[in-house]
């Protein structure tokens, strides 16, 4: 072993110990999750909820667009109809063990009934507990869009009023009068 190899080897050892010393006092990147709260981005896609309109009725009209657009098929629902002609889901089920939280269901929903919240703590011990029914998903408030009411904007007949007669609703367009 030559003197050059000995000095090089000793220098490498000293440099390694110096780097370890620097990293020992540096700020840690690991976040101690349960003790320290996690700051997620404002548009983080977490738990899916069903919202209500300003009148307190559930917004979902059981159009089945969310189930059709879901790439993993974790949403299932059955349509039913009230006496006034308003549609609602008889049952609404999301299997969160299959959900990839892509947000396509929220984008496809015409009534803004499905919304993704920043809540990500959904750990369960049994896989069956990750299947959420309508009662588990339905929240008491309107969510991100507090003033939006689908049935006021769509021009559907509700509660004995014909199309275009409800508050904040324009008269339906007569498409035959548009012809030349």
From Swiss-Prot:
It comes from the Bacteria. It is found in: Cell inner membrane. PROSITE patterns: 4FE4S_FER_1, 4FE4S_FER_2. The keyword Electron transport does not apply. [4Fe-4S] cluster 1 binds at residues 60, 63, 66, 109. It is an enzyme of class 7 (translocase). One of its GO terms (biological process) is aerobic respiration. InterPro entries: 4Fe4S_Fe-S-bd, 4Fe4S_Fe_S_CS, NADH_quinone_OxRdtase_chainI. One of its GO terms (cellular component) is plasma membrane. Its EC number is 7.1.1.-. SUPFAM superfamilies: 4Fe-4S ferredoxins (SSF54862). Binds 2 [4Fe-4S] clusters per subunit. Pfam families: Fer4_7. The keyword Repeat applies. It catalyses: a quinone + NADH + 5 H(+)(in) = a quinol + NAD(+) + 4 H(+)(out). It is a peripheral membrane protein. Its main location: membrane. Its cofactor is [4Fe-4S] cluster. GO terms for molecular function: 4 iron, 4 sulfur cluster binding; iron ion binding; NADH:ubiquinone reductase (non-electrogenic) activity; quinone binding. Residues 50-80, 90-119 form the 4Fe-4S ferredoxin-type domain. Belongs to the complex I 23 kDa subunit family. NDH-1 shuttles electrons from NADH, via FMN and iron-sulfur (Fe-S) centers, to quinones in the respiratory chain. The immediate electron acceptor for the enzyme in this species is believed to be ubiquinone. Couples the redox reaction to proton translocation (for every two electrons transferred, four hydrogen ions are translocated across the cytoplasmic membrane), and thus conserves the redox energy in a proton gradient. NDH-1 is composed of 13 different subunits. Subunits NuoA, H, J, K, L, M, N constitute the membrane sector of the complex. This is NADH-quinone oxidoreductase subunit I.
């Amino acid at each position: 072993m030559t003197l050059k190899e000995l000095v090089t080897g000793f220098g490498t050892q000293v440099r390694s110990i110096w780097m370890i010393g620097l990293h020992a006092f540096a700020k840690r990147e690991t976040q101690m999750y349960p003790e320290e709260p996690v700051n997620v981005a404002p548009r983080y896609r977490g738990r899916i909820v069903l919202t209500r309109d300003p009148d307190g009725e559930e917004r979902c009209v059981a159009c089945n667009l969310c189930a059709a657009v879901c790439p993993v098929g974790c949403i299932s629902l059955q349509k039913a109809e009230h006496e006034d002609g308003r549609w609602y889901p008889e049952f609404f089920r999301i299997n969160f063990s299959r959900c990839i939280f892509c947000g396509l269901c929220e984008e496809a929903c015409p009534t803004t009934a499905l919304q993704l919240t920043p809540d990500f703590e959904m750990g369960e011990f049994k896989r069956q507990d990750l299947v959420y029914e309508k009662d588990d998903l339905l929240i008491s408030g309107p969510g991100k869009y507090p003033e939006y009411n689908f049935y006021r904007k769509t021009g559907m007949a509700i509660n004995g009023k014909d199309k275009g007669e409800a508050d904040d609703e324009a008269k339906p367009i007569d498409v035959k009068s548009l012809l030349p």
